Structures are given as structure tokens and as C-alpha cells.
Amino acid sequence: MLKKTITALSLLCILAACQSDDNSSPQPKPRKDIALTRAEQEMMDLGTDFAFRFFNQVCKTEVEKPNLFISPLSASLCLSMIANGALGNTLSEMTDVLGFSGYSLEEMNNYNKKLVEALLDLDNTTQLGIANSIWIKKGFGVHDDFVSVNKKMYDAQVQELDFASPKAPDIINGWCAGKTNNCIPKVLNEIPETARLYLLNALYFKGIWKNQFKKSDTAEEAFKNAD
């Protein structure tokens, strides 16, 4: 049931990471821990477990790709957003995958909102952007509760769009480019007739090295495992 639900729409988890050549950085603000309740700490531990399971599964299915760069947080946020539109067995399977089966949707949403807000404010020397959007085919009915909870808890941009228009992919690609500082300018070539809804998460990261290194000291070499 979960597989059928996921294939009925499209999930795009977009991750862009850019290195900085700028040696300057703002004065770091004092480090502070993210204050979590016991339940929220348990959810964070479960989220970490999901991240490793997700990475392991991707590695198994993408064996022909030597390098993988993925964001389990993006996947978790996408599935959490969709879970707000699910019921019955589909909802149970989604929360089981995320590791949040012992928590209500309200608890999951509140935790995700708190986590994202804390991450965005955690390090002033790092540029971090986390954005969500939902693109609905014009005329396709979506429950108001699904839209409102994703707007409120995930700060999602929700827009109805004429998927038959040749400009539709450009509009979605434009959102992606804007949220990744043009690191990923294109995610769609065309929109198939069967598409009804696109749910996107974009994560942009640009960090400053605490200890800079010279580019001239870096060269491509074969990577070897410990064994």
C-alpha cells in the first residue's frame, strides 16, 4: 500500500552543497544545545536510525554509482509531510518506516518543526536552507487539512499548477534553482500525464572550513577501504 501511495505522486528530495573559497567568516556565536524533551530526544534517536537505514538501502539500490550524496533529513521531511494525508495501513507503514509509529502525527509534526527551526539557527558561520513545496495539478482535489498542516508545520509553499502547460516544468525548476542558490537548476524535463502532485524538499548547505586548506594540496587519487 505504501509503494502504491508513493508512486501516485512524485517526491523530489533536492540536496545542494557548495564549498566556499571565501576565507572570511562571521564571528561564531556561542554554541548552544537544542533543548529537547525526553520524547523529542527519543524521536531524534529514531530519526538517526532512519538515516542509517535509508543510506544503507540507497547504497544497495545504487550499486553502480561510486559516489552518493544524499540527505536522510530531506527524505524524512518528505515522508512526514505525506503522512499527514494518509490513513489506515498506509499511515501505519509510513510512520513505521520513519520510526515514529509510537507517536501521533501532531507529535511528529511538532518535532520536525522544532528540529528544522533549531538547525537553521544553530551556526551563523554556515549557510543552511531547508525549503518545502507542494505542486498540485490544476483541478485535482486535495483536502484542506493536508494543505494547512504542511503550510503551518513545514512552511511549505503550496501552489496549483497547470501540468499540461509547457511552462510548468520551468516553474518547478525555477523554485528548485532559487532554493539551492542555482546549484541545482533543473529537476524536471517534462511532467507526465499521470502526475497529480509533486512534493519537493530542497536543502542547501554552504559551510566554511574552520581550518582552511590549499587547493593546490588536493589531487584526485584512488580511494581505498581500510581492508
What residues fall within each predicted segment?
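Sec-dependent signal peptide recognition
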Residues: 2-8
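C-terminal motif of bacterial Sec signal peptides marking the signal peptidase cleavage site
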Residues: 14-17
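Bacterial signal peptide processing site
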Residues: 19-22
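Post-signal peptide N-terminal segment of mature Sec-exported envelope proteins
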Residues: 27-47
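Mature N-terminal segment immediately following signal peptide/propeptide cleavage
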Residues: 45-59
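Post-signal peptide N-terminal segment of secreted/secretory-pathway proteins
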Residues: 56-131
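Non-catalytic, conformational "gating/processing" segments within enzyme and secreted inhibitor domains
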Residues: 65, 105-227
